[in-house]
């Protein structure tokens, strides 16, 4: 009885640990060839590739752990593998983030958005959690809560496509101070752009394709999400992701 209880609790503990990682990675796996296709010469260096590879490894480990035939020794081995993988990933990501500290990312403001930006955004590689790029903006005319909620920070790749269009409440970053109802021309705004999927603890993306997009990060654009330009980027990204899901399903089905 004690042995059965131990086995049950041991399995539950390992599942919980992997589950925490899979909350970030999400379901599904990408092939090794997909990971090898991810470029490492962009603004974010090898972090997107390392993230995608980590996701693959965690998903593979999960599949092994959920095998119908899993002995007590295999449970312990799987947990040890996961612990080692997690620590190795932390070290790799920490080194990669530190190497990016201070690196500049261009930022633009869409015509019609009442703001200007001073210089570029700079990566803060010394923070825990999300990797951020920080900069300073300025109102060019009065701001209200009504139009503030329309403005989003969109990461754009080298081909002019959106990498993501919605995250964290609709923003891929924050415009601190823009929410003030009495925003005045000349008032300073702190701009914080989030780089998704490359945290110290590893991946927050479930697909190598997501990391392929981040690997091609070229700039951020502050946009009005009610404009046709934003809506076009959003629809294009949705179509691209839908096609990727169909391609993955065909691959699993052997087509």
Describe the function of each predicted region:
Residues 111-149:
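Short, surface-exposed binding/anchoring microloops in extracellular/periplasmic proteins
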Residues 62-78:
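Charged, low-complexity interaction regions
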Residues 26-28:
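Bacterial signal peptide processing site
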Residues 81-125, 229-248:
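Transition segment at domain starts
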Residues 159-217, 224-228:
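Short, solvent-exposed, Trp/other aromatic-anchored flexible loops in extracytoplasmic proteins
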Residues 20-24:
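C-terminal motif of bacterial Sec signal peptides marking the signal peptidase cleavage site
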Residues 47-60:
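Short amphipathic alpha-helical heptad-repeat segments
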Residues 2-12:
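Bacterial N-terminal signal peptides that target proteins for export
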């Amino acid at each position: 009885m004690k042995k059965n209880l131990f086995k049950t609790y041991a399995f539950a503990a390992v599942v919980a640990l992997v589950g925490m990682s899979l909350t970030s990675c999400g379901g599904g796996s990408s092939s090794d060839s997909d990971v090898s296709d991810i470029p490492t010469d962009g603004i974010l260096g090898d972090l997107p590739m390392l993230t995608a590879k980590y996701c693959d490894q965690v998903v593979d480990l999960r599949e092994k752990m959920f095998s119908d035939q899993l002995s007590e020794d295999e449970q312990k081995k799987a947990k040890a593998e996961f612990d080692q993988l997690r620590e190795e990933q932390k070290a790799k990501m920490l080194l990669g983030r530190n190497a990016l500290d201070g690196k500049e990312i261009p930022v633009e403001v869409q015509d019609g958005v009442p703001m200007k930006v001073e210089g570029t955004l700079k990566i803060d590689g010394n923070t825990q959690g999300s990797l951020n790029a920080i900069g300073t903006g300025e109102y060019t005319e009065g701001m209200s809560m009504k139009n503030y909620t329309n403005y989003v920070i969109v990461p754009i790749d080298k081909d002019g496509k959106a990498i993501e269009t919605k995250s964290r409440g609709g923003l891929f970053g924050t415009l601190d101070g823009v929410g003030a109802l009495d925003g005045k021309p000349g008032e300073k705004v702190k701009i914080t752009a989030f780089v998704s999927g490359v945290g110290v603890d590893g991946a927050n993306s479930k697909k190598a394709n997501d990391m392929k997009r981040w690997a091609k990060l070229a700039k951020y654009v502050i946009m009005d999400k009610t404009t046709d330009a934003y809506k076009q980027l959003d629809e294009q990204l949705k179509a691209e992701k839908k096609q990727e899901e169909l391609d993955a399903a065909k691959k699993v089905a052997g087509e």
